[in-house]
Amino acid sequence: PPGAFNRVVNTVVDFQNNMAGILSNHIVTYTQDYADHSPYLSRYASKLTPILPPVELPDPLPGAVQAFAEEHHVKERRPVIGMAARFAAEKGVEVLLDAMPMILKKYPKAQVLFAGMYQNVMGEQAYYDRLMPRIREYEVQGHWTFFGNLDPVQMAAFYPNLDVLTVPSLNSTEAFGLVQIEAMLNGVPCVPSALPGVRQPVTMHGMGRVAKIGNAADLAEAILEVLNDPQKFKGDITAIKKSYDPDSVAQEYEKLFARLMKKGK
């Protein structure tokens, strides 16, 4: 946000980030795609290595997936579009909201299940107040449900009930979108925005389609494409699980440490 105080804060943070980059022996980023498009990371290209993040979810409690489906009328209100994020402008909630009329035209019983903090989000009250009148209409009609924050076990019951997960983020504060991998591990395709890094899970694993940043019509088109032909977006879940397995990721860090130790001799 504009203002003298925020300018001072940004200057201090930029200085600290630059010192960290200069003094570090090496920098790890989740994807080369994000690094290449980052004004900060691209300055340190010679000391960058991309390593995917570890991702794992607990198993759902016995009967939890079915209980979730019954409680939220998943069989009657399909397809189910999931979003797992804070209610914030940068997360692109408004883009999904603007896409809903186009989605409902094709699928009149579609619903959005929103997992994540949505009330009293710091700095987002004006955004919340502006969008909520429209969202409340969808809530009344059974097209939108908020859950608030869910713990990992609850998320393990959330994902299997989705037909698609969307990550319509708008700026580079989103570097990857780990929730996409959690969804894919449950066989759920994703529709992210084309932000560097955020587009990589779908690009790498083929489970979904990338939508233009901030474009509600393209987001709707991408979601509809995935919903219309889900078999087309089935991925190799075993391979995906292996790529993000904590032990596999740890091995990549061990290789990096070995290279750095050898280089330092």
Residue map of PLM features:
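A short, active-site helix/loop in glycosyltransferases that binds the activated sugar's phosphate group
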Residues: 10, 14, 18-50, 55-59
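A short helix/loop element that forms part of the nucleotide-sugar donor recognition site in Leloir-type
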Residues: 60-74
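Conserved donor-binding/catalytic core segment of Leloir-type glycosyltransferases
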Residues: 74-91, 97-100, 113
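Nucleotide-activated donor-binding/catalytic signature segment of Leloir-type glycosyltransferases, i.e.
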Residues: 125-153
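Short alpha-helical donor nucleotide-sugar binding micro-motif in glycosyltransferases
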Residues: 149-150, 157-162
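Acidic donor-binding loop of glycosyltransferase active sites
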Residues: 160-174, 188
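A charged, aromatic-enriched C-terminal amphipathic alpha-helix characteristic of glycosyltransferases
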Residues: 231-262
